[in-house]
Regions:
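Mature, structured domains of secreted/extracytosolic soluble proteins
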Residues: 4-6, 19-351
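Repetitive helical segments and hydrophobic/amphipathic motifs
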Residues: 11-12
């Protein structure tokens, strides 16, 4: 239920997307006073707490070690080995108990959920560009993560796991279907004290608004509440400056919880409500995602997929690009009483 409160809280707040910056910086162009690279900092943990062997294993397995050694503009939110041990010992979303059980797709979600393009101090997370000369502070609540849409493809083989009483899914109940739960880029959601105060969310005191949203005490004074949260994890070592970006250590492993539709579907005490809202969704064939995945598959010697579908909710107002979604997968109009007010599966939701 805590994740659902978080989803409901940030759904109505602002959006800021950073640009892609994976260019490599020559070794001789790095200023010495900045210290080591992000990769070297993770290996030495000079300014961090604990060891980061598991996180580094993800980095190496995904071929990202050179990027974090040389790329000029990155921000990462790593968890240490103790946090990963808790993750594997817990009832995690992947259902795995060891690193060896992780699939390549799971590894990508774990690493790229904790990474932003652009180098950002924790205090800058909620800032957005106002114009060429000014910045608006305490506005943004999310940034585009490094996760690709094709990293989140799911194959549903069991018809019982598809929305029940929904005829749009009947053609796939016996043969299965490959889906993404949204074809827009997954976001990293962050809560900073400045952003919350700008939205009249109190952050200190035992009964502050943020304690209620989190379901736990978050600090009784300003000093204790002045850190930032990434989803439900807290930054415990922030602004570790490296040659090629910043490291903000978090207390637990970051894993993108998905959009509101996914959270409702996964939480045990919201499954009935999920079944109600899933009556208003359908699988739409997505040619871009299909082509992107197959291009990657051919380059990496993997099997291609004939068709990948996107789960979308019928919406009278807010869906992708801020437009309504009032046509079904066949292009037929959807009755008004079969639409929601907004698309629960839209990762990049923003109020218009």
């Amino acid at each position: 239920m805590k994740k659902l409160f978080l989803c409901a809280s940030f759904a109505c707040l602002g959006l800021f997307c950073s640009c892609q910056k994976d260019e490599l910086v020559p070794e001789d162009s790095k200023p010495e006073w900045l210290g080591s690279s992000i990769y070297e900092e993770l290996k030495s943990a000079t300014h961090l707490t604990g060891t980061f062997d598991t996180y580094l294993r993800l980095v190496k397995d995904l071929g990202y070690d050179e990027v974090l050694s040389r790329t000029g503009s990155k921000t990462i939110f790593p968890a240490n080995d103790d946090a990963f041990a808790r993750f594997f010992a817990s009832k995690n979303a992947f259902g795995v108990t060891s690193y060896e059980q992780l699939t390549p797709a799971m590894k990508k979600q774990l690493l790229y959920s904790s990474m932003l393009d652009n180098a950002m101090l924790a205090s800058m997370l909620s800032n957005v560009k106002a114009d060429d000369n000014n910045v608006s502070r305490g506005v943004a609540v999310k940034h585009a993560s490094n996760i690709s849409v094709i990293d989140s493809i799911t194959t549903i083989y069991n018809g019982a796991l598809m929305p029940q009483g929904n005829t749009y899914w009947d053609a796939y109940r016996t043969k299965g279907i490959n889906v993404v739960y949204d074809a827009t880029k997954p976001m990293i959601v962050h809560f900073t004290r400045e952003q919350m105060l700008n939205n009249n969310i109190t952050t200190t005191g035992t009964d502050c608004d943020f304690s209620i949203i989190r379901g736990e005490k978050v600090g009784t004074n300003i000093a204790n509440s002045d850190t930032a949260y990434i989803f439900q994890t807290r930054i415990i070592n922030q602004d570790v400056t490296c040659q090629n970006g910043y490291v903000h250590q978090v207390n637990d492993v970051i894993l993108n919880p998905g959009n509101i539709g996914q959270v409702l579907r996964s939480e045990g005490n919201t499954k009935l409500f999920s079944r109600i809202v899933d009556y208003h969704c359908a699988p739409y064939y997505n040619a871009i995602t299909t082509n992107d995945y197959n291009s990657w598959a051919r380059q990496n010697g993997e099997a291609t997929i004939d068709s990948i579908f996107e789960v979308r909710y019928f919406a009278s107002a807010h869906s992708q690009d801020g437009r309504p979604n009032v046509l079904d997968p066949s292009g037929n109009p959807v009755a008004a009483n079969h639409r929601l007010n907004w698309d629960l599966g839209w990762n990049q939701y923003y109020p218009s």
